């Protein structure tokens, strides 16, 4: 049974709630002091994990639509991608403000050079920015075939973002590995397209 347009609309509402409610939980956690003795790190990790979850969810849409024979699911991909960018931006802001401080924001450039995992993170964010800015139908029409080429850069983000996470943790735990393996599986499902894009 294929999903209807009405069901897709409700699915989009569910995506909004699933992506927005964690932000309210984040605010409440800060207000109530639910984080550990290092809340800045907790916030950075939380926002980073949310970004990765939404990135993986975005990549999952096409295989689900194709193998599940649900073509209308593709209509959810843009929304997931925009939420991924929103959480990625929050992740970047949380590091810049909480880790460096507003008075030392100029240190960000030096940090990017001395900490390679940050370089991967900022590259991932810049790619997400380019995808978010060009996610409109107007941009798609104006760019023509180049639009798809640009948006295939999400595969690069799917490689860099899990590496950024793995590299950033001081003690290796199962969670970063799970994200990396999941990303690898999702890329493997699109092996032919990924290989064509790499050429």
Swiss-Prot record:
One of the record's GO cellular component terms: plasma membrane
Show the InterPro entries listed in the entry: Fe3_Rdtase_TM_dom, MsrQ-like
Cofactor, free-text remark: Binds 1 FMN per subunit.
* Membrane topology value: Multi-pass membrane protein
Q: Where are the transmembrane segments?
A: 10-30, 79-99, 118-138, 147-167, 169-189
Cofactor section: FMN; heme b
Q: Name one GO molecular function term.
A: electron transfer activity
GO terms, biological process: protein repair
Alphabetically ordered keywords of this record: Cell inner membrane, Cell membrane, Electron transport, Flavoprotein, FMN, Heme, Iron, Membrane, Metal-binding, Transmembrane, Transmembrane helix, Transport
Location(s), subcellular: Cell inner membrane
Task performed by this protein: Part of the MsrPQ system that repairs oxidized periplasmic proteins containing methionine sulfoxide residues (Met-O), using respiratory chain electrons. Thus protects these proteins from oxidative-stress damage caused by reactive species of oxygen and chlorine generated by the host defense mechanisms. MsrPQ is essential for the maintenance of envelope integrity under bleach stress, rescuing a wide series of structurally unrelated periplasmic proteins from methionine oxidation.
Q: Which family does it belong to?
A: Belongs to the MsrQ family.
**NCBIfam families, per the entry:** PRK05419.1-4
- Give the record's subunit note: Heterodimer of a catalytic subunit (MsrP) and a heme-binding subunit (MsrQ).
| Name of the protein | Protein-methionine-sulfoxide reductase heme-binding subunit MsrQ
Organism encoding this protein:
Yersinia enterocolitica serotype O:8 / biotype 1B (strain NCTC 13174 / 8081)
